[in-house]
Amino acid sequence: MSKVKKNEETLSEVLVDVNRITKVVKGGRRFAFSACMVVGDKAGRVGAGHGKAKEVNEARGKAKQAAKKRMMKVPLYQNRTIHHDVIGKSGAAKVILRRAKAGTGVIAGGSMRAIFHSLGVHDIVAKSIGSTNVYAMISATFDALNKLASPKSIAMRRDKRVNEISVKSYDV
């Protein structure tokens, strides 16, 4: 009897990037593939992974496993946007994530869009500045998502009640 992990079949997978890698050796060239994948449950959990192998399918599998290992929980406001604006950096890549009103949609490019889709965010505005390298963008986006905090967690850190901390208008 095999064990089935919960949420195993509910994870959404997005293949963000596939590259062919060439290693030049004495006898010629050796080809391999690298893949970058984002996985999420569309309910506030997301992860990204990178895998390398001789075949594309193997690289995808390794990337998927790495993404599952690195999954993280992100606090969402009304299960559709983020609680506050945040900036993330990774190397020369910088991303700005801004909360948005209902009906705005996901305004983001490339790999950021894949992350938000897998995360379950429906309304967000994201701007990338600097490097457009896929791996740097994903890393910067995860840096920004790590900085997010719900008003409840901020209040707990400050030993206060939620209504005592300064909270922006939540009519967004």
Curated annotation (Swiss-Prot):
GO molecular function, one term: rRNA binding
GO cellular component: small ribosomal subunit
Entry-linked InterPro entries: Ribosomal_Su5_D2-typ_SF (IPR020568), Ribosomal_uS5 (IPR000851), Ribosomal_uS5_bac-type (IPR005712), Ribosomal_uS5_C (IPR005324), Ribosomal_uS5_N (IPR013810), Ribosomal_uS5_N_CS (IPR018192), Ribsml_uS5_D2-typ_fold_subgr (IPR014721)
Single biological process term from Gene Ontology: translation
Function: With S4 and S12 plays an important role in translational accuracy. Located at the back of the 30S subunit body where it stabilizes the conformation of the head with respect to the body.
Name under which the protein is recorded: Small ribosomal subunit protein uS5
Signal sequence region: none
Keywords assigned: Ribonucleoprotein, Ribosomal protein, RNA-binding, rRNA-binding
Free-text comment about domains: The N-terminal domain interacts with the head of the 30S subunit; the C-terminal domain interacts with the body and contacts protein S4. The interaction surface between S4 and S5 is involved in control of translational fidelity.
Recorded family membership: Belongs to the universal ribosomal protein uS5 family.
Subunit structure: Part of the 30S ribosomal subunit. Contacts proteins S4 and S8.
Upper classification of the organism: Bacteria, Pseudomonadati, Pseudomonadota, Alphaproteobacteria, Rickettsiales
Domain spans labelled S5 DRBM: 11-74
